[in-house]
A protein has these predicted regions:
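Bacterial Sec-dependent N-terminal signal peptides
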Residues: 1-22
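Signature for phosphate-centric chemistry
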Residues: 19-151, 155-325, 329-427
Length: 427
């Protein structure tokens, strides 16, 4: 009985940890409150352990799509606008001592941002170097040997190209004999970076209605106001509280993209931090996920990319391709791809945005800065069946076909599933 009780406690502990809420995750790691601005989870967290492949199977090919690493904010107004609002409050003597300090720090940050808007940071470069190092450590068979060829393609945006080059540098250090074909050309953007007029219109309508309503419902700035302003009535009557709070939250969230000690998380209590994540999570689900609000349309933006992944894998399996196809782009491309491929719970449909938080559709698990999806292909000398494993941010995820060897899946079954899905979409 004693041993049974101990085992039960261990089971409950594991289950509780596996089902940890976003609220609890944010309490333990405030970076997660940044949502899509969250930096890559390692080395803050322990890198997940990988399940050994079935006996006799060895990795031979990798197919990948990754988001650029941590960056500066992509609009100068994200730095200047909150300064202007705080200067107005300061002019009337309405800032607290902490508010005055924040204004000073924001001015310093804005000066540092000059000429670097949207660019990769030192943190972002380091993320990709370490990702590549773990690729070669986890799957040396793919990258070892004198005839290894790696094809890398990037969005034409500089931060993506530099993310690619930081990984390439580490791959070449692991195997100086490998051939790396690196390219960032408009010729590949038809499948690497995507969007269309329908998606833009659906997003515009959702922002104006459902997302706006969700944001307003979860906007409770009391603690923030008390930290920043000495006159609550002035702040409510004379300032755009929603705008200033959201602007400072953006900067706060993105400070983890820099090697800096400056932090503004103390301006927000636990509820405000959580609601920032909640709003961002809902935003991404609607504008790039399978949300009914946007007609379930957004994942289909990734169809050309998925087709490229299938075709590239066919070539590699037939011995006519390369050892690895690495693609570097953006969060707005990675999110639809993961949803289209139905990895983990990211293909699930939720009719009520309030249900998202209790699910496992969490944006910080999907697209942090430096986020990436890796498909690892395995073969055995004793079987013709190719197996594949999906890693999202180096964590094993389920795939949408049955398997007795999960997280390893039959590529034949997966390929047929995805081909059928792409064909059905054409009708």
């Amino acid at each position: 009985r004693k041993y049974t009780y101990i085992l039960l406690l261990l089971f409950l502990a594991v289950s509780t940890n596996a089902q940890k809420s976003a609220w609890d995750e944010i309490k333990e790691d405030v970076c997660i409150a940044g949502g899509g601005y969250c930096s890559y989870p390692y080395p803050r967290h322990e890198v997940p352990k990988l399940t050994p492949a079935p006996k006799g199977y060895k990795p031979f090919y990798m197919s990948h799509y990754g988001r650029h690493g941590s960056r500066w904010l992509h609009d100068p107004a994200q730095y200047s606008n909150p300064i202007q609002v705080l200067e107005k409050a300061d002019k009337y003597g309405k800032l607290t001592a902490r508010g005055k300090e924040v204004l000073k720090q924001l001015r310093e940050i804005e000066v540092s941002s000059k000429g670097r808007i949207g660019e990769l940071t030192t943190v972002g470069a380091r993320q990709h170097q370490e990702i590549a190092q773990r690729m070669t450590k986890n799957f040396p068979e793919i990258f070892r040997g004198k005839n290894v060829i790696v094809d890398t393609k990037s969005s034409t945006v500089m931060r993506c190209a530099l993310s690619m080059l930081n990984e390439v540098k580490e791959l070449e250090a692991f195997n100086p004999r490998m051939t790396v074909n690196a390219d960032a050309s408009g010729a590949d953007m038809w499948y690497m970076v995507y969007g269309d007029s329908k998606a833009a219109q659906l997003e515009k309508e959702a922002r104006a209605k459902e997302l706006k309503a969700f944001d307003e419902k979860h906007f409770h700035p009391d603690y923030f106001v008390s930290k920043m302003f000495n006159d609550r009535q002035f702040a409510q009557d004379s300032l755009d509280l929603h705008g200033i709070m959201r602007a400072i939250l953006d900067i706060t969230s993105n400070q983890q993209s820099h090697d800096t000690e400056i932090s503004f998380w103390d301006l927000f209590d636990e509820q405000e931090r959580y609601e920032n994540w909640l709003i961002d999570n809902a935003f991404w689900y609607v504008v790039r996920g399978p949300s009914p609000i946007t007609e379930g349309y957004m994942p289909h933006l990734a169809e050309n990319l998925l087709n490229n992944i299938l075709e590239s894998a066919d070539k590699a399996i037939a011995g006519k391709g390369v050892n690895a196809n690495l693609r570097f782009g953006h969060d707005a491309c990675l999110v639809p791809l993961v949803c289209l491929m139905e990895l983990g719970d990211f293909g699930k449909v939720f009719n009520d945005l309030e249900d998202l938080a209790a699910s496992r559709w969490h944006i910080h698990d999907l697209t942090t800065m430096g986020a990436n999806m890796q498909l690892i292909f395995y073969r055995s000398k004793k079987s013709d069946d190719i197996l594949v494993k999906a890693l999202l941010n180096e964590k094993e995820l389920s795939m949408p076909v049955p398997s007795e060897t999960a997280p390893y899946y039959s590529w034949k079954a997966l390929r047929a599933y995805y081909k059928s899905k792409l064909e059905a979409s054409k009708k």
